[in-house]
Amino acid sequence: EFEEYLANHPFNQREHLTPKQWKKKLVKKDRPDLAWEQDFLMTMDPAIKTVPKERLFEAYQYAEELRASMPVNRDASWTEHGPSNVAGRSRAMMFDPNDFENKKFWAGSVSGGLWFTDDITVSNPTWIAVDGFWENIAISTMAYDPSNTLVFYVGTGEGWGNGGAVQGNGIFKTEDGGNSWTQLSSTMGDDTFDFIQKIVVDENGNIFAATRPGYWWGGNGGIYKSSDGGNSWAQVLTGSTDYPKGADIEIAADGALYASLGIFSTDGLFKSVNNGETWSQLNSESNGFPSDFERIEIACAPSDANIVYALCAGGS
């Protein structure tokens, strides 16, 4: 049964080339999906035909128990040797809404976790790391709830297909302004939430997340909505491809939602004026916006709800 499953798996339906043929045919861009393919085939459980992510968490907890039981030389002296002049990628940044002086600032690294400083205005701010032993530290997006500014949401996973991308594992939440955090069980161990490209929260506390699945054959990305603080989610925009990938979502000054799908395939730019219940596609060629873009990043002018910017990229 397992051999039949592998034979019919999408990976075995595509063209397989020799290394020499790959060099001639493979496009000149990062292809982490090929590494994900190999990783999937090496780590999947034949009995359930998928990767048992819940066991990874159990193994992590067991490793922590072993580490805690080992003797530690607390008198050891450490000296940092750097490098200290090279910054990693930071895709998530946010001024703390509870600091009316606009000094406290949050920043998330795609492979280095979540950090904050109490005073971003000084020339050399002191940065403090939030618990570095989160189940996942690939921080990709961050947002707060306008209806309760003590509530923050942090998404994980860098899903742009670059070679250094780190896969995520759902969304984290704080209800006390960042003092303590929990991982939303509704997003844990689910391929749909392996890469959270963007999170926004409207004035009523509704959460919208642009997601893409961890592997191109699994999960079901797109735009998801939660109206209960992240306890449950509903897909509100799926696009036109077999494996939809949410790229971005923004809220305009009048509350309208703008979302983009695609990333590695042409899908589109969409708008909703009823909290994500229905959507209209904007890149229809007839209005001057081309329909063949793959990745689309969006920005809405806070001063004018009628002004929307779209930064686009094609396959080449």
Question: How does the language model describe each region?
Answer:
Residues E1-S316:
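Extracellular glycan-interacting surfaces
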